[in-house]
């Protein structure tokens, strides 16, 4: 069995100096010799902590404005030396063992993201010596303790105290894994930055989709189970994300979020973010089952719920305004709910919701314009990567192709349900009237079947389809879609267009006196 390592000598070189003085004092108190680079050493000395500067330890000064500090055989030899194997060479060159390496790196990603970023500053924040120290110490984890996270300082000191100055092999291995993960992430960030500098706008595709894709996700939490109870699962955060999203929400109350809760809440939040006026989105199994706008979110919720009360049971509700007391009371009175998500939640609303301890309440914070990013879909043996579908349309993008011009209300409903249909599984059909969905047909292999389901939902909930607007996420391949819409009383259709039978479909619209709008944008969602 591998013996524990007694800490006698430690090298400290940190960019983030949080709690480093406390760690150094604890080590010094236990008789550990401290070696440190210039900036860290200055801080420690000013705190009254005895430390040997690296340049004094090696007999070689820091040079090139600090670019070369720790890249010296006495440092790396002391870290990489194997006990009982390299002892002779150590004695020959008067190299001492370094038992602990505490390093965190220059803040490269933060510098790149800063408003004052320039290329020279970015390059100078590429840490060379620090990554070399971490890799050397992690490679020799059987003989060295490597510490990259300030969150590990206390636990390491506690272990040293409990083990007479020693750190176990298990701990050393876990710390080495963290160090290699940290350097891998760091190198990936550097690669991404230089990749963005190489490619021009004319080769945008190459810039977004490099030959090798390295993206880092950090575990936020383990889940009780995945989509089904026999599947293990966890939730990871995209380290590049700068946008308000389900990943950045704060849970204010309720049980831990499940895998399906997170998936549904993401769909609901992203859909409600499309609307500028007060809106409510209710989602079940990642599909919107009802969406409505209103003068207040209370009115929006009432209109959305009444669209499809059956499907709303056990769903996720999202708002784009602060959740108030009246709306919270209305939700509790009307239905069982898994998750409520809103930018903020009024204190009075929280107090009433606290009586229903199982309801998960999330605060997303106020969001801004969505940030272009990548969308992933894993297939067996590979990964499909595409840009997020963030295309928005407005009144000026609409192309009216029918003889009858849509009314002002029909145009408003068309723009409304076009926002909704983007979030419905294909083939997707949405009926809307007065900026409220009255029927949604999702996920059917036939577009005509999705249209039939949408009309059935409306009829079952006693909602009048006559005079409504219909949105289709993709073009109608045949006129039967328009014929079906006309039978139930649809007066306006919004769709991408682009079928080889567009003229046949336009003719059908004219025969039924339906106003038809082309967007020239498709919104498949598989």
From Swiss-Prot:
MGS-like domain residues: 1-148
Assigned keywords, A-Z: Hydrolase, Multifunctional enzyme, Purine biosynthesis, Transferase
Listed InterPro entries: AICAR_Tfase_dup_dom_sf, Cytidine_deaminase-like, MGS-like_dom, MGS-like_dom_sf, PurH-like
Catalytic reaction equation(s): (6R)-10-formyltetrahydrofolate + 5-amino-1-(5-phospho-beta-D-ribosyl)imidazole-4-carboxamide = 5-formamido-1-(5-phospho-D-ribosyl)imidazole-4-carboxamide + (6S)-5,6,7,8-tetrahydrofolate; IMP + H2O = 5-formamido-1-(5-phospho-D-ribosyl)imidazole-4-carboxamide
A GO CC annotation given for this chain: cytosol
Domain of life: Bacteria
Residue stretches spanning the membrane: none
Signal peptide extent: none
Metabolic or biological pathway: Purine metabolism; IMP biosynthesis via de novo pathway; 5-formamido-1-(5-phospho-D-ribosyl)imidazole-4-carboxamide from 5-amino-1-(5-phospho-D-ribosyl)imidazole-4-carboxamide (10-formyl THF route): step 1/1; Purine metabolism; IMP biosynthesis via de novo pathway; IMP from 5-formamido-1-(5-phospho-D-ribosyl)imidazole-4-carboxamide: step 1/1
E.C. number: 2.1.2.3, 3.5.4.10
GO biological process terms, semicolon-separated: 'de novo' IMP biosynthetic process
GO molecular function: IMP cyclohydrolase activity; phosphoribosylaminoimidazolecarboxamide formyltransferase activity
Short name of one Pfam family: AICARFT_IMPCHas
Domain commentary: The IMP cyclohydrolase activity resides in the N-terminal region.
Entry's family note: Belongs to the PurH family.
The protein's name in its UniProt record: Bifunctional purine biosynthesis protein PurH
Upper taxonomic lineage: Bacteria, Pseudomonadati, Pseudomonadota, Gammaproteobacteria, Candidatus Palibaumannia
